[in-house]
Regions:
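Active-site-facing substrate-recognition patch
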Residues: 1-59
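Conserved PRPP/pyrophosphate-binding segment of the phosphoribosyltransferase/PRPP-pathway fold
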Residues: 39, 43-93
Length: 93
């Protein structure tokens, strides 16, 4: 199984919540996708880094980041995946 397929399986198994869910808006939904359950997971987070590096392979960049809280674990996962590949990549928040 490649990283992308593994990540998809992790998302389906850990991030998708089925059943009645009350959203922060107060509205009701039949399902909810909580990707924090993936980006902060010991098995899934490395897959996030691998897949994000693969998806951005054609771009030139030296650092990754975004709005704090949501982007922090993604940037960190990419930093570690890059190091594993022998590439120096910084993260910022």
């Amino acid at each position: 199984m490649n990283s992308r397929d593994g990540l998809l399986a992790e998302i389906k198994n850990k991030a998708v919540v089925h059943g009645k869910v009350i959203l922060s808006s107060g509205k009701e939904a039949n399902y909810y996708v909580d990707l924090r359950r993936v980006t902060l997971d010991a098995v899934a987070a490395p897959l996030v880094g691998e897949v994000m590096l693969d998806l951005t392979a054609d771009l030139e960049f030296d650092a990754v980041g975004g709005l704090t809280l949501g982007a922090d674990p993604v940037a960190t996962a990419m930093l570690h995946a890059a190091a594993k590949r022998g590439r120096q990549l910084d993260a910022f928040v």
